[in-house]
Amino acid sequence: MVITLVGEKLAKPGLEFIYYGPGEPCKTCRLARVCIGNLEPGRRYKVIKVRNIEHPCPLHEGKVRVVEVVEPAIEVLMEPRYAIAGSKLTLRFVDCNDPEKLDLVRPEGLFEGDTVKIIEILGDVECNGRKFKLVKVMREKE
């Protein structure tokens, strides 16, 4: 669990967001260490709790709220031979060029080379005449 700040409109339990990096106003903000210092660019986060503390912010339409976030489980396609529930492995993206499946081939929030734990096998997906497994994974932090 990570404590951070998000715009008031995003401060809702269950809401997910991708952190893309600091905005220009963040570079001189006194709250930057708490707000963006705990987040990793390119990662997906899920708000699990909203605290009753708010601060002014020029980037987020006036106000940010203190929230608790976690990295959620993410769905990704995987080679069937590696798709074993409970196993940990180094993530390798599959070769699938179907634009409709891009969010499952290279989901935002995961990077090739991440260590992940397979939480659940969700089913089979075909792409380019090959069968892959759709799995739900959690990133394992080093």
Swiss-Prot record:
It holds the Pfam family UPF0179. InterPro entries: UPF0179 (IPR005369). Belongs to the UPF0179 family. HAMAP family: UPF0179. This is UPF0179 protein PYRAB06360. It comes from Pyrococcus abyssi (strain GE5 / Orsay).
